[in-house]
Structure formats: structure tokens, C-alpha cells
């Protein structure tokens, strides 16, 4: 009896995690460059049931009577790195990173992904956000974190009257302030989310620069913002499915609770 209780409980926990993932995706639907998390349900290994043959002298002969599933769990979440829609804003601090060509991993059949490197207190992190701003030192930043140039230095401009070419060269008042660096993750499985807008590498190593890589073609578009790739309609539909599944397993647990209560309080009186 308890096996069924454990199975229903694991399903509730899995659906709760799924709901949290979908809620976070929906909450960031309007966040520039946000990449939707995705996850899939997996079953725990099945347990093989058998019984001991009572006629066997040694009592060691067994007959298989079937198997039982021991529950489900939600696999580790991973972002979906497909490019979001592009929106023209005419704001000089909106700079979209457009992936024209990136290599495909032969092992995972997934495309590589390009990122802006930013400097944080914990080291270099990587962002897909296209919304830039200037800090008090007139450095180009993403959410207050300086964007690094190909020389691994922050890029300082005189004011918001600067231009960015398609290869990332920043010009302000007639001088070149630097070239915005772009890094490439060949295997996106090596990335882990660090907050909603940053990523880091699982092994702690820096991503290689995409500049000069003949397998990569990209362009930077000033005055253009990349939107999130969250499909809000699909997310709400999945949210409804998760709620219904959660409630169904909740009812199963309530039924088990009533059965165990009857076994403990009524059958025990006989």
C-alpha cells in the first residue's frame, strides 16, 4: 500500500517543481534575452516483484509476478537557447546579438550559443540580454555589470551618443572605445544558470571568444532588443496540466490516508 503512497507523493513533488519552473518562465516573459527553462519527467527505476515458492524445500525458488513503478521525478532544468524575437526600439543602449551561423554539436545535436561576457564580483559570467546601460563611470553594462571588450576590459564611452558596428566596434565622439566581445558555448550542457540573466560554466573555465572563428557568423544590431523566447500561451497550458496532475495525485494520497485510517482504527477492533 505504501508503494502507491510514495508514487503519488513523488508525482506531487515533480509537478510542484514543474509549476515553479513555468511560473518563473512566465514572470520573465518580458525580460530581454531571457531563455525559458525546460524540464522533462522521468520515472524512477521499476521494482521487480517476485514471490517465494512455498512448495520449494529450500524456499529459494522465486516466481516473477510483475513490476511496479516507484514514482517520477523532474530532471534537472536546462535553458532553451533558441533566439527570441527581435524588436526595434531605436534606443542606442539596446544592442541585440544575432546568431547568423553557429556550429552544431555532433554529440547532442544542439546548436552552440553566443553570449556577452560581463564582469561580476564572482568572475566572468555570460548574458544574452540586449538591454545595456551606462554606470557612473560611463561603462557599458548589463544590469550594472561591465561588458568586456575583446581585450577583456570594460568599455567606456563619453555619453549615450555612441555607435556600435555589426562586429561590435564601439565608437564615441570619433574615437574607438573598444570592441564588444562575444563568447561561444559549443556545448550548452556545460552552462548553468546564475540568476535569471546570467550563466556560468560548470567546469569554471572561460568560454572561448567567437570573434575570428570561421565556423561562427554573428552581428550586433544597435537600437534592437531581443525578446525572451518564452511561449506564454504554451506555458499557461502546461501550468493548467501541472495543477490538474497535482490535484489528481493529492486525491490519491487522501484515498490512501482513509484506507490506512480504516485499517488502524476499524479493522484493529475486530
UniProtKB/Swiss-Prot annotation:
Superkingdom field: Bacteria
UniProt key word Oxidoreductase: no
Keywords: Bacterial flagellum biogenesis
GO CC annotation, single: bacterial-type flagellum
GO biological process: bacterial-type flagellum organization; bacterial-type flagellum-dependent swarming motility
A Pfam match: Flg_bb_rod
The keyword Protein transport belongs to this UniProt entry's keyword annotation: no
Family: Belongs to the flagella basal body rod proteins family.
Known role: Not required for motility.
Protein's name in the database: Flagellar hook-basal body complex protein FlhO
Source organism of this protein record: Bacillus subtilis (strain 168)
Gene: flhO
Amino acid at each position: 500500500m505504501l508503494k502507491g503512497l510514495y508514487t503519488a507523493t513523488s508525482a506531487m513533488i515533480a509537478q510542484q517543481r514543474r509549476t515553479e519552473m513555468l511560473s518563473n518562465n512566465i514572470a520573465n516573459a518580458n525580460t530581454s534575452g531571457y531563455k525559458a527553462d525546460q524540464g522533462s519527467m522521468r520515472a524512477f527505476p521499476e521494482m521487480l516483484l517476485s514471490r517465494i515458492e512455498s512448495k520449494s524445500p529450500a524456499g529459494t525458488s522465486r516466481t516473477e509476478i510483475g513490476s511496479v513503478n516507484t514514482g517520477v521525478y523532474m530532471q534537472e532544468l536546462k535553458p532553451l537557447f533558441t533566439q527570441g524575437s527581435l524588436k526595434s526600439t531605436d534606443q542606442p543602449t539596446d544592442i541585440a546579438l544575432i546568431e547568423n551561423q553557429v556550429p552544431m554539436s555532433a554529440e547532442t545535436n544542439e546548436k552552440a550559443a553566443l553570449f556577452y561576457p560581463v564582469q561580476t564580483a564572482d568572475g566572468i559570467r555570460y548574458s544574452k540580454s540586449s538591454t545595456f546601460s551606462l554606470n557612473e563611470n560611463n561603462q557599458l553594462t548589463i544590469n550594472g555589470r561591465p561588458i568586456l571588450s575583446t581585450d577583456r576590459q570594460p568599455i567606456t564611452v563619453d555619453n549615450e551618443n555612441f555607435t556600435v558596428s555589426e562586429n561590435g566596434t564601439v565608437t564615441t565622439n570619433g574615437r574607438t572605445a573598444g570592441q564588444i566581445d562575444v563568447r561561444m558555448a559549443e556545448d550548452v550542457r556545460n552552462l548553468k544558470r546564475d540568476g535569471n540573466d546570467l550563466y556560468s560554466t560548470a567546469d569554471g573555465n572561460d568560454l572561448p571568444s567567437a570573434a575570428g572563428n570561421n565556423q561562427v557568423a554573428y552581428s550586433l544590431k544597435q537600437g534592437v532588443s531581443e525578446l525572451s523566447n518564452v511561449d506564454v500561451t504554451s506555458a499557461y497550458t502546461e501550468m493548467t496540466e501541472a495543477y490538474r496532475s497535482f490535484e489528481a495525485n493529492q486525491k490519491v494520497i487522501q484515498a490512501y490516508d482513509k484506507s490506512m485510517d480504516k485499517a488502524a482504527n476499524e479493522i484493529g477492533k475486530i
